[in-house]
Amino acid sequence: MRAVSKKKKTPENVIALNRKARFEFHIEETMEAGLALEGWEVKSLRAGRVNLQEAYVLIRRGEAWLIGCTITPLPTASTHIKPDPTRTRRLLLHKKEIARLTGAADREGYTVVPLDLHWKRGKAKLSIGLAKGKKKHDKRADQKEQDWQRQKQRLMKHKV
C-alpha cells in the first residue's frame, strides 16, 4: 500500500494574495487564523471576489479583527440582508496566539498584516504575519534584486 502524501497549499487553494505586504514589510513570523464569515461572503470567496490590498489586523480587547478587507457580494446575494463589503471581520485565534501577537505588535515599528486568504479542508483561512516596516532603501534593494533575477532568467533562456 502506498503512502498518501499530505496536500500542500497549492495555488488552487489560494483565494487572494496581499503582494503589497511582502514588498512593504519584513515578515518575521506567520500564523494561520480562521474567519467568522456570513453565508454570502463564503459564496463571494468561492467566486474570488476579495481584495486584501488595504486590509490590516487590529487586536482590541483580546480579540483580533480584520479591517479593510473588501469582499464584493455576488449579484445573486440574499435579498433579505444588506451585504456590507468592507465590514470588520473577527479572526478566530487561540488566546495564546492573540497574547503573543499583542505583545509583539506593541513593540515599536511592528504590526500584524494579512498575507493571503486560502482554503484549508473546506474552510477559509487567513495567513497573517508579524511584520516590521521596510525603509525606502530596503524596498529599492529588493526591487533591484528582483530585476537582476529576471534578467538572469532571460539570459539563461536565450543561451539554451
From Swiss-Prot:
Main location: cytoplasm
A biological process term (GO) from this entry: trans-translation
Xref: CDD domains: SmpB
Alphabetic keyword roster: Cytoplasm, RNA-binding
InterPro entries, per the entry: SmpB (IPR023620), SsrA-bd_prot (IPR000037), SsrA-bd_prot_CS (IPR020081)
Positions with biased composition (Basic and acidic residues): 139-150
Origin superkingdom: Bacteria
Any single Pfam family the record assigns to this protein: SmpB
Subcellular location: Cytoplasm
Listed GO CC annotations: cytosol
Keyword Amino-acid biosynthesis: no
Disordered: region residues: 130-160
Record-linked PROSITE patterns: SSRP
Positions with biased composition (Basic residues): 151-160
GO molecular function, one term: RNA binding
PANTHER family: SSRA-BINDING PROTEIN, TMRNA-BINDING COMPONENT OF TRANS-TRANSLATION TAGGING COMPLEX
UniProt family annotation: Belongs to the SmpB family.
Function: Required for rescue of stalled ribosomes mediated by trans-translation. Binds to transfer-messenger RNA (tmRNA), required for stable association of tmRNA with ribosomes. tmRNA and SmpB together mimic tRNA shape, replacing the anticodon stem-loop with SmpB. tmRNA is encoded by the ssrA gene; the 2 termini fold to resemble tRNA(Ala) and it encodes a 'tag peptide', a short internal open reading frame. During trans-translation Ala-aminoacylated tmRNA acts like a tRNA, entering the A-site of stalled ribosomes, displacing the stalled mRNA.
Name of the protein this chain belongs to: SsrA-binding protein
The organism's taxonomic lineage, starting at the top: Bacteria, Pseudomonadati, Pseudomonadota, Gammaproteobacteria, Chromatiales
